Amino acid sequence: MMRIAKILSLAVGAIALCVTSAAAKKPIDIDAKMQEYGLVDIATIDASILVELKYAGTDNFVGSNMYGSLRKAYFRPEIARAIAAVQRELRRIDSHLSLIIYDAARPQSAQQQMWNVVKDTRYRRYVAKPNRGGHHNFGIAVDLSIARDGVPVDMGSDFDSFSEVSHIDNEASLLRRRLITREALDNRRLLRRLMRARGFSTYRREWWHFQQYDINYARRTFRLLDF
């Protein structure tokens, strides 16, 4: 897992103070809030999909829990159904394989925390500005990978690796320079093929990120997770 905590230590320290201050307030029932906003837990659609929300722990680029008690992956219902369809196809290909979800619907408060960390660094291009919301803030994006028997397969880089190796727009060059393996490239291509077949589009800097809907349409149509 690539870490930028040392580079961003001052920003992370500021976030820690904010989290401490926020902890003094009455905590919200985040699962109830997600449902209030019309989102569904992916486990209610397909319980076989693995969920390991990276921002609900410390194994992320910030190095702190930004999701509090949230442990479930929430999406708009049609997005959840599309992901479940990908899972069925993946299991049909190989019953030992499963999707593993690293991020799903993201409250705007968590988006603000991420932005506070990266806004004055070269990593800001990887994080959507929180003022209007990005795809995750509407429940229409997913960060995920493939696992075999519960263990993530080789994708060439870790989740949230803010580097060229996570990009998908020049993978032939990455392979030629031995920055990723043929196995990793094949795994990426399998994931993309299955996700695209269910209407998802990609983000060129992150092999793990998939989304549906144009963001401007989403802002006009869907409810921002403004909590």
Language model features with spans:
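Coiled-coil-like amphipathic alpha-helices with heptad-repeat character
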Residues: M1, T20-S21
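Bacterial N-terminal signal peptides that target proteins for export
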Residues: M1-S9
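Bacterial N-terminal signal peptides
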Residues: S9-C18
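Extracytoplasmic cell-surface/polysaccharide-interacting catalytic and binding patches
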Residues: S21-A104, M114-R205, Y213-F227
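Segments that shape or occlude catalytic/ligand-binding pockets
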Residues: P107
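Short, well-ordered surface patches within globular domains
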Residues: A110
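Conserved metal-phosphate-binding beta-hairpin within the catalytic cores
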Residues: F210
